[in-house]
Amino acid sequence: MTDQYVLALDQGTTSSRAILFNRSGDIVSLAQKEFRQIYPQPGWVEHDPQEIWGGQVGVAAEAVAKAGIDGRSIAAIGITNQRETTIVWDRETGQPVYNAIVWQDRRTAEFCDELKARGLGELIRSKTGLLVDAYFSGSKIKWILDNVPGARDRAREGKLAFGTVDSWLIWNFTHGKVHVTDVSNASRTMLYNIHTLQWDAELLDIMGIPASMLPEVKSSSEVYGHTHAAHLGVEIPIAGVAGDQQAALFGQQCTTPGMVKNTYGTGCFMMLNTGDKPIESSNNLLTTIAWKVDGKVQYALEGSIFIGGAVVKWLRDGLGIIRHSADVGPLAQEVKNSDGVYLVPAFAGLGAPHWNASARGTIVGATLGTKAAHIARAALDSIAYQTRDVLKAMEADAGMSIAELRVDGGATVNELLMQFQSDILAVDVVRPKITETTALGAAYLAGLAVGYWKSVDDIQGQWQLDRRFQPAMAADEVLANVKGWQRAVNAAKVWADDQA
C-alpha cells in the first residue's frame, strides 16, 4: 500500500486535536484547537456543535499540512470523542436544533431521580450496564425534545437526527450521507442494549425518543463512508470509531481479558477488559462495551474518579501552596511521606466505587508539625488511593487479580505518584513511551479496517515501555496506609451523613 499515514481525530471536552501516525505508531504531526465552554446556568454545560465541527476539520487540515503531505497519503481516518455529549440536528439542513449538551451537564438529574423513584434503575442497568444518571445521553435527548419548540413533532416525523460527537463529525465529513455510531459510543447513551446489541425499544419508550432519530450502530473498525473531497482534497475512508476511554484501552493494547489501564487526567478513568461477556458489577462500576473488531464484541468494567489531577490544580489555585502544577512533585519530595495526613478530594462528592454525592473534601491527621509538603504529598497520594479503590472493586467484580496497571495521561509524568501507585497496589505500574493512547487507539482501529495494519497481533509489538514501576513498600506499611485512607474516606462520608 502506497498510503503512508493514518489520521486520528481526537475530539475532546476542551479541545479538538488531529494526530498523524505512521506505520510504526509514531506521531508524525499534531494540531490542536481549544473551543468555548458554554455555561448558561449553574450545572449546565454546552458546546457549539458548529464550532466543534469547524475546529476539528481545521486541525485535520493543519496536521496534514504540517507533515508536508496531502490527503492522498492518508490511508484512513479514525475518530475518538468525548462520550455521552449529545447533539440533535435537522436532517434536511444539517443545522443543530440546540447546542451540544455535554456529558458533565446535570440539568436532567431530576428526571433521572424520577426514573429511579419509579423503580426503573435495575431495568435500565440490566439492559445497558449503566447506573441511571444525567451523565448519559438518553435524558439529554429527551430534554432537547421537551424544551426546543417543535422538536418533538419534528422528531416524530423523522426530520431530526441524534448523534454523539462521532456521529456528528461523520455526518459532516460525508455531507449528510452517513448517519452512524459505533458500539462503544452507543453503549453510553442509556438507550442501547449491550446484550442484544440493539437500540432498546422499551428504553426508547421510557425516554420518549423516536427510533428514527438514532444512528445505525456499527463495529469500531470498518469503513463507514468517505470524507467529501472538499475537506482534504480527496475522498478518504473513515474507518475507526471509539469513545475516548475505550480508544485509550485499545491504544494501550489492553486487548485480552484481565488487562487494565488508568488514564490520569482532571479525573481518572479506569477500564478493565473483561472479554466477550459483560460482567455485572456489584461494586458500583459501569459495565460497558469496549469495542467490536472483526465481528467480536469485547466488554469492559469502568470506574470514574472525579478528582484526579484536579487536586493539584486546587493546591495551586485554591490553597496557593504551589505556583505551577509541576511544582507539586518537588514540594511533595521534601518529606519522606505524608506523616499520617490524608486528603480526600471529595470536592464534588466521591465517584466509583463509592458514588456518594454528598461527601466533601476532607483533610485528617494534621498536627502543628504538618507542613505544606505533607499536604502536597497527601494530595498526590489521594490519586493513588482512589485508583486502588476502583481497582479492588474491579478485581472483586471480575473474580481475577490484576497483574499490572498500564497508565497514561498528564499526571503519569510524576515519578513520585507512579511509584506510590505501584507500592499501594502491590502490582507493577507500566508507562508507555507514547502517552497519546486515545488518538493511537482510534488510528489503530481505522488502520486495521483498511489493511494498513494486518491484525491486532501486528500492532501488539508496537507497544513500547517507557518505565516500569515496581512495588517497593513493605506489606505491613501498605496495610497501615490503606487503613488510614479508609478511615479518612469514612470521615468524608460521615461529614455528609451528619449534614443530612
UniProtKB/Swiss-Prot annotation:
GO cellular component, one term: cytosol
EC number: 2.7.1.30
CDD domains, sorted: FGGY_EcGK_like
Family to which this protein belongs: Belongs to the FGGY kinase family.
Residues annotated as binding ATP: 13-15, 266, 309, 410
Annotated organism of origin: Chromobacterium violaceum (strain ATCC 12472 / DSM 30191 / JCM 1249 / CCUG 213 / NBRC 12614 / NCIMB 9131 / NCTC 9757 / MK)
Protein's job: Key enzyme in the regulation of glycerol uptake and metabolism. Catalyzes the phosphorylation of glycerol to yield sn-glycerol 3-phosphate.
Protein name: Glycerol kinase
Catalytic activity, reaction form: glycerol + ATP = sn-glycerol 3-phosphate + ADP + H(+)
Coiled coil regions in record: none
GO biological process terms held by the UniProt record: glycerol catabolic process; glycerol metabolic process; glycerol-3-phosphate metabolic process
Activity regulation info: Inhibited by fructose 1,6-bisphosphate (FBP).
SUPFAM superfamilies: Actin-like ATPase domain (SSF53067)
Gene3D superfamilies linked to this entry: 3.30.420.40
UniProt keyword annotations, A-Z: ATP-binding, Glycerol metabolism, Kinase, Nucleotide-binding, Transferase
Domain of life where this protein originates: Bacteria
GO molecular function, one term: ATP binding
Pfam families registered for this protein in UniProt: FGGY_C, FGGY_N
Positions annotated to bind sn-glycerol 3-phosphate: 13, 83-84, 135, 244
Pathway recorded for this protein: Polyol metabolism; glycerol degradation via glycerol kinase pathway; sn-glycerol 3-phosphate from glycerol: step 1/1
InterPro entries: ATPase_NBD (IPR043129), Carb_kinase_FGGY (IPR000577), Carb_kinase_FGGY_CS (IPR018483), FGGY_C (IPR018485), FGGY_N (IPR018484), Glycerol_kin (IPR005999)
Binding site for ADP: 13, 17, 266, 309, 410, 414
Binding, glycerol: 83-84, 135, 244-245
